[in-house]
């Protein structure tokens, strides 16, 4: 991912110019994908959730996930810690996580994860992407705009489920609960293999929020869409070699569109 418009970002780009020609541009997205975004009466109430750190539009590669710091849900019964339900899965030597959750009552369920910091040597940053997804259950339609209280978070201004292809998604980028003027937001579609981007700029869409931190994007294809608000962290973190390095903080939300 990128941190647009910061001196630190510009400096890192200058240092990485030698690699840029050889390595295609690729945005990191923390995925948190449920089996469905809407649970209906008579439907399956047991939700499978997949947590993967990857490049969704390019269908990989998958990056190795450390054990998440926290994983939970904010629902009609309040907040619950779901970290004990996580199961680590490995493919091609890279770790991802899965979990199951039993929906028991009507309401909206905001699933969220704080992943372990990820070291990206190509950009010289530690990456922490606070990610959430909202599932509506049994037609209640209440609670979809609840905020978790993550350090960086997108508050939806449009109900983030029950969306048709072409609908406009709007949200507010917040840091520590306050809107972030002119925040950078990256958008990617979770590619099912049916689309080959004609050039790198088509892989990741880039939005600049307005002075109130509000952004909007019309989703042109059915499937899962990831919105990632990217900010520079206030404090450095140590990389695997113990050196303090900048931090990319992300607030992500996933929404799904369906064809009419």
Predicted regions located by residue number:
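Short, acidic Ser/Thr/Gly-rich low-complexity loop/linker segments typical of extracellular
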Residues: 194-212
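Short amphipathic, basic-aromatic surface patches that mediate peripheral association
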Residues: 53-61
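Short flexible loop/turn segments that cap and initiate beta-strands
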Residues: 61-70, 178-185
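Short tyrosine-centred short linear motifs in exposed loops/low-complexity segments
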Residues: 44, 95, 103-111, 164-166, ...
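Beta-strand-rich domain onsets/edges
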Residues: 28-48, 124-183, 189-193, 243-260
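Aromatic sugar-binding surface patches on proteins
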Residues: 88-98, 211-214
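Bacterial N-terminal signal peptides
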Residues: 12-24
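Short acidic/polar inter-strand loop motif in beta-rich domains
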Residues: 58, 116-123, 233-239
């Amino acid at each position: 991912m990128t941190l647009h418009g910061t001196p630190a970002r510009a400096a890192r780009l200058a240092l990485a110019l030698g690699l840029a020609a050889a390595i295609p541009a690729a945005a990191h997205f923390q995925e948190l994908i449920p089996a469905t975004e809407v649970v209906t009466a008579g439907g399956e109430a047991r939700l499978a959730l997949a947590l993967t750190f990857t490049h969704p539009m390019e269908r990989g590669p998958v990056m190795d996930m450390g054990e998440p710091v926290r994983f939970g849900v904010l629902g009609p019964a309040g907040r619950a810690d779901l970290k004990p339900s996580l199961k680590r899965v490995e493919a091609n030597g890279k770790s991802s996580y899965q979990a199951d959750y039993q929906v028991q009552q009507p309401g909206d369920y905001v699933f969220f994860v704080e992943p372990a910091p990820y070291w990206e040597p190509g950009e010289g940053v530690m990456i922490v992407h606070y990610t959430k997804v909202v599932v509506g259950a049994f037609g209640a339609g209440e609670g979809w705009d609840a905020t978790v209280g993550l350090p960086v978070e997108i508050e939806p201004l449009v109900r983030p489920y029950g969306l048709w292809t072409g609908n406009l998604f709007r949200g507010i980028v917040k840091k520590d609960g306050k809107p972030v003027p002119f925040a950078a937001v990256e958008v990617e579609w979770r590619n099912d293999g049916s689309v080959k981007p004609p050039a790198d700029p088509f892989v990741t869409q880039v939005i600049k929020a307005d002075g109130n931190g509000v952004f909007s994007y019309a989703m042109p294809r059915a499937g899962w869409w990831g919105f990632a608000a990217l900010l520079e962290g206030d404090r450095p973190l140590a990389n695997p070699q113990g050196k303090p390095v900048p931090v990319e903080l992300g607030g992500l939300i996933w929404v799904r569109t369906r064809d009419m």
